[in-house]
Regions:
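Bilayer-spanning, highly hydrophobic alpha-helical transmembrane segments
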Residues: 91-99, 340-367, 377-385, 391-395, ...
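ATP-driven catalytic headpiece of P-type ATPases
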Residues: 88, 300, 424-467, 497-578, ...
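Conserved cytosolic catalytic loops of P-type ATPases
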Residues: 5-7, 31-35, 39-49, 53, ...
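Conserved ATP-binding TGD loop and adjacent catalytic N/P-domain core of P-type ATPases
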Residues: 2, 38, 503-505, 537-539, ...
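Actuator/coupling domain of P-type ATPases
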Residues: 60-76, 124, 130, 134-238, ...
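Juxtamembrane helix-loop transition segments at the membrane interface in multi-pass membrane proteins
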Residues: 149-154, 213-228, 395-414, 734-742
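Flexible metal-binding regulatory segments at protein termini and peripheral loops
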Residues: 1-125, 137, 224, 240-241, ...
């Protein structure tokens, strides 16, 4: 099954999104989800049966367009075209609605009308003038009619259908009243309804313009990220400095960056040193020092030194491109909380049309007359707002994920953003998560006839090609002492135990107590040393030669400066903290005590970590796992929420739901706080959207007027209310932009 993201064009409300989903999902081997806020289609389909063209034809059959690869520049261009078009239409509508209102209602307020327009003197001219003034307004709102009636014919009515039916009913009644003036009843000028149609269209155009502008602000995070990438870069070609477009950069090119310039792509510094502002990528406020050999990330700003770097990642492979992709995917995804709103939106418009018809018929048969019945009928149609329901969740998700990205917290889906605030237990991996993951060798104790430098040479030689941080500490110590590292043979890594290799004809084993026990190697002589080292928070490893204990090497990892503060924040939030590690119990307890962690699960093999998470979940705990994504991917995937600590350059950790780019544990609390704020915002939006419709529709239907002698809602006021209901939801979502991620 292929999974793709496309852009849908021509949608105006949640019912439109539902129509596209419905058209696609009725086909076998297609699973589609449409986000009205981002106008994105997430679709899975069998590539053997479908391709983009077939998917596009299905979408077009529902009355909408589909674009495969829409660049951000094209999106901005289309957005500006939409804003410009709405402005022009609104201006056209306003130019004609003002005289329309003056003629139709001015005389009621004592405003003077020329005699040829005076309804008491010339009722027909009075009616025809309003009809003529209404025509340009209808033209300004032509999309409501064309889309609305087309979707009605397709049996997928949308908000445009409600507007089209309501405005058309008002216009047709106006034409009928005009006919009556000519034929039988000059007093029919009292209820022409042209002004209702004109004002409804004008107000909804105004609301649509506000909605489009506000919706544009909700996606500002993506625009900021895209804006980080420079258009050009300076490279060295045949010894000559040359400026080229960034899309023409190749891996291996040497790029020149001067102070104040943006770094074009990811790379490794080959000349010079500087400090780099990575705040827009990671949220890190302080510049980061860089020297030869260090990695630089495209989109960051070179502060105070000229550097040359070799391009290592370009195009879609850069960190910035991956961040943009992850944020776009998250903003296009749906949170489970939106399901109820989606179900309601799917049936909303047909139900509203039914309520409007019942309302109109009920008032007419009650003896209130056609004019009153029509007024209530139109009011019900135009006050109903499926858009408020459809936008309630995705807009908050858009702003929330964008806010996270601005602060170095990449939330990969709407579901992750929704569920993170529920976390009650957090399990932390130790190495690279609580500690820096860069251990140093602290002790080397030799037994028997072996010398310390001899053991260090053996250990460093067999560990030389290992990528494990503990091995790196041993090798670095040997290199620092200029000890010769020699070749080895038959290397074998045993995860959770240690390593085995042949060195100069001897079998070497380096590992933990479990490894020694499995090989029945007597370690009694080292027990005291082992305990002392463990109690000091170090990780002791046994070295055996030909199945005899030769020594102990101890390595210690440095605790991150922010780890203790991060744990304190989480405990204040009422969250239980656990450290999960392969270290021995005493070492693990020492580290946990240093940072204030509640519980420790030690001596766990890598493959057992996910099982430990599962055991916690079986106790009805909502568990998050925090790790570096290297040897704890199964545990990250098993957890209710997997949180990966990034390193500023690795953001595509597949098994994680959230990636913390800054490698700062304090961002775990930030992610939880952001999730809570976003869910609160979504609930506010949903409450407002449901409350508005639940209260507004009965009010428009005249329930309060009929039974409680309350006010009667004019269709024009109903249109005003509907126009601002969506804007209010969007405005509330935008409040998240001011949320402080601490």
């Amino acid at each position: 099954m292929a999974e793709k993201i496309y852009t849908v064009t021509g949608m105006s409300c949640a019912a439109c999104a539902n129509a596209v989903e419905k058209a696609l999902n009725k086909n076998e081997d297609i699973n589609a989800s449409v986000n009205i806020a981002t106008e994105k289609l997430n679709v899975e389909y069998d590539e053997g049966k479908y391709d983009f063209d077939k998917i596009r034809k299905i979408v077009e059959s529902a009355g909408y367009g589909l674009v495969e690869n829409m660049t951000e520049d094209r999106k901005v261009e289309l957005y500006q075209e939409k804003i410009t078009s709405l402005k022009k239409r609104l201006i056209l509508a306003i130019v004609f609605v003002i005289p329309l209102l003056y003629i139709s209602m001015g005389h009621m307020l004592g405003a003077a009308l020329p005699e040829f327009l005076n309804p008491k003197v010339n009722a027909l001219n009075f009616a025809l003038a309003q009809f003529v003034l209404t025509l340009p307004i209808i033209y300004a709102g032509r999309d409501f009619f064309s889309h609305g009636f087309k979707n009605l014919v397709r049996k997928s009515p949308t908000m445009d259908s409600l507007i089209a039916i309501g405005a058309t009913a008002a216009i047709l009644y106006g034409i009928y009243a005009t006919y009556r003036i000519v034929t039988v009843d000059p007093e029919a000028h009292m209820d022409l309804y042209y002004e209702s149609a004109g004002v409804i269209i004008t107000l909804i155009l105004f609301g649509k313009l506000l909605e489009a502008k506000t919706k544009g602000q909700t996606s500002s995070a993506i625009k900021k990220l895209i804006g980080l990438q420079p258009k050009k870069a300076k490279i060295i070609e045949n010894g000559v400095e040359k400026e080229i477009l960034i899309e023409n950069l190749k891996v291996g090119d040497i790029v020149i960056v001067k102070p104040g310039e943006k770094i074009a792509v990811d790379g490794k510094i080959v000349e010079g040193s500087t400090s780099v502002d990575e705040s827009m990528l990671t949220g890190e406020s302080l510049p980061v020092s860089k020297k030869v050999g260090d990695k630089v990330v495209g989109g960051s700003i070179n502060k105070n030194g000229s550097i040359r770097f070799e391009a290592t990642e370009i195009g879609k492979n850069t960190v910035l491109s991956q961040i943009i992709k992850l944020v776009e995917e998250a903003q296009g995804s749906k949170a489970p909380i939106s399901r109820m709103a989606d179900v309601v939106a799917a049936y909303f418009v047909p139900i509203v049309i039914g309520i409007a018809i019942i309302t109109g018929v009920a008032w007419f048969v009650s003896g209130s007359g056609l004019v009153t019945a029509l007024s209530f009928f139109i009011a019900v149609l135009v006050i109903a707002c499926p858009c408020a329901l459809g936008l309630a969740t995705p807009t908050s998700i858009m702003v929330g994920t964008g806010k996270g990205a601005e602060n170095g917290i990449l939330i990969k889906s709407g579901e992750a953003l929704e569920t993170t605030y529920k976390i009650k237990t957090i399990v932390f991996d130790k190495t690279g998560t609580i500690t820096k993951g860069k251990p140093v060798l602290t002790d080397l104790i030799a037994y028997g006839n072996y010398k310390e430098d001899e053991l260090l040479k053996i250990a460093a030689s067999v560990e030389n090609d290992s990528e494990h941080p503990l091995a790196e500490a041993i090798v670095n110590e040997a290199k620092g002492k200029n000890i010769e590292i020699k070749p080895y043979e038959k290397f074998r890594a045993m995860p959770g135990y240690g390593i085995r290799a042949t060195f100069e004809g001897k079998e070497i084993q380096i590992g933990n107590k479990k490894l020694m026990e499995n090989k029945k190697i007597n370690v009694e002589i080292s027990q005291k040393d082992y305990n002392i080292l463990s109690n000091e928070g170090k990780t002791p490893m046994y070295i055996s030669i030909d199945n005899e204990l030769a020594g102990i090497v101890a390595v210690a990892d440095v605790i991150k400066e922010t780890s203790r503060e991060a744990i304190e924040k989480l405990k204040k939030m009422g969250i239980k903290t656990i450290m999960l590690t392969g270290d021995n119990e005493k070492t693990a307890e020492f580290i946990a005590k240093q940072v204030g962690i509640d519980d420790v699960i030690s001596e766990v093999l890598p493959y057992q970590k996910s099982q430990k998470i599962k055991e916690l979940q079986e106790k009805d705990e909502f568990v998050a796992m925090v790790g570096d994504g290297i040897n704890d991917s199964p545990a990250l995937a098993q957890a209710n929420v997997g949180i990966a600590i990034g390193n500023g350059t690795d953001v595509a950790i597949e098994s994680a739901d959230i990636v913390l780019i800054r490698n700062d544990l304090r961002d775990v609390a930030g992610a939880i706080a952001l999730s809570k704020a976003t869910i609160t915002n979504i609930k506010e939006n949903l409450f407002w959207a449901f409350f508005y419709n639940v209260l507004g529709i009965p009010f428009a239907a005249g329930i309060f007027y009929a039974f409680f002698n309350g006010p009667k809602l004019d269709p024009m006021i109903a249109a005003f209310a509907m126009s601002f209901s969506s804007v209010s939801v969007l405005g509330n979502a935008l409040r998240l932009k001011f949320f402080k991620v601490k």
